[in-house]
Curated annotation (Swiss-Prot):
Disulfide bonds: none annotated. Mn(2+) binds at D15, H203, H205, N239. This is 2-isopropylmalate synthase. It comes from Campylobacter jejuni (strain RM1221). Belongs to the alpha-IPM synthase/homocitrate synthase family. LeuA type 1 subfamily. NCBIfam families: leuA_bact (TIGR00973), PRK00915.1-1 (NF002084), PRK00915.1-3 (NF002086). The gene is leuA.
Length: 511
């Protein structure tokens, strides 16, 4: 290994899972592990085998399937934990036992009820036992960020003597600041005589929002492994986010000179989405690197700059993490340059329309609708569509019966005619979708469906967003109601109306 390679140790399946309301299934964990292997993660911490039979089996299955990443299991500094970790890991091509014990005064006295000498003895015994199973042993000083520095140095020195090849320095409660954490690592390298015999790792939590900053500050002082999770999942406020620290190393080569990882960055976005879907943990829209707004531009000034040179407002190319679609949002803040570019992308010559006229009508629509899509812009050009009330399909009545055979009955007004259909589905939402498809005689494919609470309490409103694909083009719909089925029906109707208007535009083009 070259000195400046940063080992990426992913603990999504262990520390990340601890943040979830319920445990993941074995096959779900395997799916994530295989995605992490494909991403290029060096070490995958697959779980804590002694904690449950389910975790043991998950670690065992992952160990048997993953070939290119080292599989790691966590254990306390107890013989039974270490033995159980080995039993789960022994089928792996490459495996690591990760044992830990708390070293801060607070944890030793109030949690473990032991003094430093007892803790030191337990740590050495655990490392020696783990070494009887493998040369790849990692030792963590839990709550290192609040451990007296002389004690920490002595513990690290003795852990290395006992045979630990990786020493992990966790900021367990996210307490330290970057300069402070960097100084801890610096002191370790200056005071621990055998520090060169082990790789120094860091595991930073995000309680004060410093996890990524602390991790990066540590590698500047000699740390060469970063422990992190996809999307920053983890206890309380989470862990250092893999996507953030990896892209920071890749993007700021001017400052983080010579450092690199083996992560295949083009797989970051799809891995993030996969983990979000499996864990049922939504990604905040403003989340760095992978949030839906991370590469979105709605300000007219920003859009104009990006259209001229993307680097004016983008320090990372979306394609670098595997995003290839356009993230320019058309809102009331968009300027003429954005509208002109969108029309050009749709194939309209600037000599065929009056930009000032189109822009004026666009602003009126954007004020009412919020976000405007390219098909809305085309409708403005051909249909003078400016009002959300100008809909071909309007839901008049809706009823749903749940149970063994979910059934929906939808009554829609199409112009002046009322049409009613009843359909079944795998759930009430699908039943409603099937009704609308039959009434409209349009057969789009549902590509995305999401629900977000827009208020709190028993009368909370939920917003449903859907993406429908029709003839190779995506159409968005939005619905808002205290009833999720009603909100879903509104969202479907909104998207169907967008499809209908696009068909009318095509008719006008052909005329």
């Amino acid at each position: 290994m070259k000195d400046n390679k940063i080992i990426i140790f992913d603990t999504t399946l262990r520390d990340g899972e601890q943040a979830l309301g319920s445990s993941l299934g074995i096959n779900q964990k395997l799916q994530i592990a295989l995605a992490l292997e494909n991403l290029g993660v060096d070490v995958i911490e697959a779980g804590f085998p002694v904690s449950s039979q389910g975790d043991f089996k998950a670690v065992q299955k992952i160990a048997s399937k993953v070939k290119n990443s080292t599989i790691c299991a966590l254990s306390r500094a107890l013989d039974k934990d270490i033995d159980m970790a080995y039993e789960a890991l022994k089928v792996a091509k490459h495996f690591r036992i990760h044992t830990f014990i708390a070293t801060s005064t607070l944890h030793m006295q109030d949690k473990l009820k032991k003094d430093f000498d007892e803790i030191l003895s337990m740590a050495k015994r655990a490392i020696i036992r783990a070494r009887s199973y493998t040369d790849d042993v990692e030792f963590s000083c839990e709550d290192a960020g609040r451990t007296p520095i002389d004690n920490l140095c002595f513990m690290v020195e003795n852990a290395i003597k006992a045979g630990a090849k990786t020493i992990n320095i966790p900021d367990t409660v996210g307490y330290t600041l970057p300069s402070e954490f960097a100084n801890i690592i610096k002191i370790l390298f200056n005071k621990v005589p055998n520090i060169d015999k082990a790789i120094i790792s860091v595991h930073c939590h995000n309680d004060l929002g410093m996890a990524t900053g602390n991790s990066l500050s540590a590698i500047l002082q000699g740390a060469r492994q970063i422990e992190c999770t996809i999307n920053g999942l983890g206890e309380r406020a989470g862990n250092c986010a893999l996507e953030e620290v990896v892209m920071a190393i890749k993007t700021r080569k001017d400052y983080l000179k010579g450092f690199y990882t083996d992560i295949k960055c083009e797989n970051i976005f799809k891995t993030s989405k996969l983990v979000s879907a499996i864990t049922n943990e939504s990604i905040p829209s403003h989340k760095a690197i992978v949030g839906s707004n991370a590469f979105s531009h709605s300000s007219g000034i920003h859009q104009d700059g990006v259209l001229k040179n993307r680097q004016t407002y983008e320090i990372i190319s979306p394609s670098a993490i595997g995003i290839h679609d356009n993230r320019m949002l058309m809102t009331a803040r968009s300027g003429r340059a954005m509208i002109k570019t969108c029309l050009e992308n749709l194939g309209y010559d600037e000599n065929t329309y009056n930009l000032d006229d189109v822009y004026e009508r666009f602003l009126r629509l954007a004020d009412k609708k919020g976000q405007v899509y390219d098909y809305d812009l085309e409708a403005l050009m051909f249909l003078s569509y400016e009002n959300e009330e100008e809909n071909e399909f309007v839901i008049e009545k809706l009823s749903v019966i749940s149970g063994n055979i979910p059934t929906a009955c939808v009554c829609m007004r199409i112009k002046e005619e009322l049409k009613t259909e009843a359909c079944t589905g795998n759930g009430p939402v699908e039943a409603v979708f099937n009704c609308i498809a039959r009434i409209t005689n349009l057969k789009p494919v549902l590509k995305a469906y999401s629900i977000n609470a827009k208020s709190s309490g028993v009368d909370a409103q939920g917003q449903v967003d859907v993406d429908l694909e029709f003839k190779g083009r995506k159409f968005h719909g939005k619905g808002l109601s205290t009833d999720v089925i009603e909100a879903s029906a509104q969202a479907f109707a909104s998207a169907y109306n967008a499809i209908y208007r696009s068909l009318k535009v095509e008719e006008r083009k052909m005329a």
